[in-house]
């Protein structure tokens, strides 16, 4: 089993993200229709257990993350995906990531069972 992060653009409304033919980028069944939309990133359950949707970093005060999407897994790891690919952030593990928020100062926050964590540059 894998977790996947997909991007839904306005032009993709009604898109087929591959189920039941693919799980993430891994083929499960043949005979898939054309024009499937594949995930931008996927990972196995050896890495995490449940992807938590991403949040765009736009003018969030961290120039190297500007334009990237932050996302994570309920088990703790947090990543950024940008035009240069996916990188795991040097972040302390959070206890059960539940979501993301942006403050009035445009800072991003990771929401977890053990608190609210501001995303800052180290």
Whereabouts are the PLM-identified features?
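Beta-propeller domain segments
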Residues: 1-87, 105, 117-122
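Conserved blade-ending motifs and adjacent loop-strand segments that build the rim/top face
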Residues: 85-104
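Short, exposed beta-strand-loop hairpins at the edges of beta-sheets
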Residues: 108-111
